[in-house]
A protein has these predicted regions:
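Alpha-helical transmembrane segments and membrane-interface helix-loop junctions
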Residues: 1-171
C-alpha cells in the first residue's frame, strides 16, 4: 500500500516536471512566433503576453517540487558546510520545519484564493479575458508537494545537505 502510494507520488511529481518543461517550450514557441510576426509586418496574436505570463507562473510552480527533490534549487550552505555534523543536522531539521510550515501556509492561502476565484467566477482581464482560477490552480497542489518534499527531508528519507558543493555543481 505504502509502496504504491510512493510510486504514485513519484509519478505525479515527475509528470509535473515534464508538464513544466512542455509549458516553457510552448512559451518559447509563442514568443518566437510573436516576434517573427512583428518583424515581417504581421499582427501577432493579442493573447501571447498574457498566456506567457500564466505559463511562467505554472512553470515555476510545477517545477518547484521536482527541483527540490533533485536538489536543483538554490540553497546557501556557506556557513553550514564548516559546522560539525550534529550541529548541521539540527540546523537542517529547523530549516526543514520552517519550510514545511511556510509551504503549508502558502498552500492554505492559495487554496482560499483558488476557491474564491472559482466561486465568485472572477475573471482576469488583460489582452484576453481568462478565468482567474486558472492563475491560482497549480498553487495549492504544488505548495503541498513542496511541503511533502521538505517533510521527506525532515523524517530522514533524504537530506538536502547529502551532496558536497562540488557534487551539486553539475545540477
Amino acid at each position: 500500500m505504502v509502496n504504491a502510494l510512493v510510486k504514485s507520488y513519484n509519478f505525479v511529481l515527475n509528470w509535473m516536471a515534464v508538464f513544466a518543461g512542455i509549458l516553457i517550450f510552448l512559451s518559447f514557441v509563442m514568443i518566437v512566433v510573436d516576434v517573427t510576426m512583428r518583424i515581417v509586418g504581421l499582427k501577432p496574436p493579442l493573447f501571447t503576453i498574457a498566456v506567457v505570463e500564466y505559463i511562467l507562473l505554472w512553470f515555476a510552480m510545477l517545477a518547484a517540487p521536482w527541483l527540490l527533490r533533485i536538489k536543483g534549487h538554490v540553497f546557501i550552505d556557506a556557513v553550514t558546510q564548516f559546522l560539525p555534523k550534529l550541529v548541521k543536522t539540527v540546523i537542517a531539521k529547523i530549516v526543514y520545519s520552517i519550510c514545511i510550515v511556510s509551504s503549508s501556509i502558502y498552500c492554505f492561502h492559495a487554496a482560499g484564493l483558488l476557491r474564491e476565484a472559482w466561486v465568485k467566477e472572477m475573471v482576469d482581464v488583460r489582452s484576453i479575458d481568462m478565468p482567474l482560477w486558472i492563475l491560482y490552480a497549480p498553487m495549492p497542489f504544488c505548495f503541498f508537494f513542496v511541503a511533502t518534499e521538505f517533510a521527506r527531508y525532515l523524517v530522514g528519507v533524504d537530506d538536502m545537505y547529502s551532496q558536497t558543493i562540488l557534487e551539486r555543481e553539475g545540477v
